[in-house]
């Protein structure tokens, strides 16, 4: 859990009974892609949206971005309708596929998106320098992005989604195509942004990433949310207990087994812990870097871009209030805000 605020923070995403039905040419309902979705994401949270292909995740994201209109239900993004133009300036979005202009360089790509957000030349230059360092693409910033590997394209896409210093970040498969080093760096970046007050909606098929990062998780299937809660709530197995100690001699293990047996509690497993393959991989790569080994790809990412450091305070000052600070429990959506939108 990496959020900067508790469950009492402002509500940045609120959905109540959201449904989307796609119709044919004759307006007959054909596919109900999203069916009665209700969820709430509070400021500073990392919220995981999971589900197999065709479960309704992408359709839900498009409705949150205002690209699709819901057939039924209500949505509020940063306290406004998803179609509110001013609110879109406070949102960063990384789609599942990297849609880039192949003949622009990495620097030109970021400059283009900075111009779309009407950043002045000095702000663009400073932010681009910091973002390129942050995602490890300084050395290849003048190469056309069409020559980038998929992992490098995801890095420039992530930098693009941050150029406007968003309050809400929607990331669809951000680590797709990345090696374990790049994946670890992106996960660390997401955690840091959340601690600085950014709100992150994360979609990923890499369940380990979601478990590492997310404060709350929703699992979709058939257009509906089938389970929702914290990872601890969803994953804790109440029927088993783990005891951890230093290396235990065989004689002590036998004594422990006898004690447990007297209480009708069989000892089902005794083993030495294993490190993860990811940690071994990262250790080997870091060792090679320390020895001066070179790579032709993306380099190790740098510090978080300085202009993002004020995310919690800066965005809070410019973003509309999304809900009362103490509104409801984490699992119950504050419908007052949505009701007010309906009346407008």
Q: Model-derived features: where do they sit?
A:
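A short, flexible loop at the N-terminus of ABC-type nucleotide-binding domains that lies
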Residues: 2-15, 21-36
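Conserved ABC transporter NBD signature motif
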Residues: 73-87
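Conserved ABC ATPase "signature" region
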Residues: 111, 115, 123-140
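Conserved catalytic motifs of ABC-family nucleotide-binding domains
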Residues: 165
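Catalytic Walker B motif of ABC-type/P-loop ATPase nucleotide-binding domains
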Residues: 169-173
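Short, charged/small-residue-rich alpha-helical element at the C-terminal edge
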Residues: 231-298
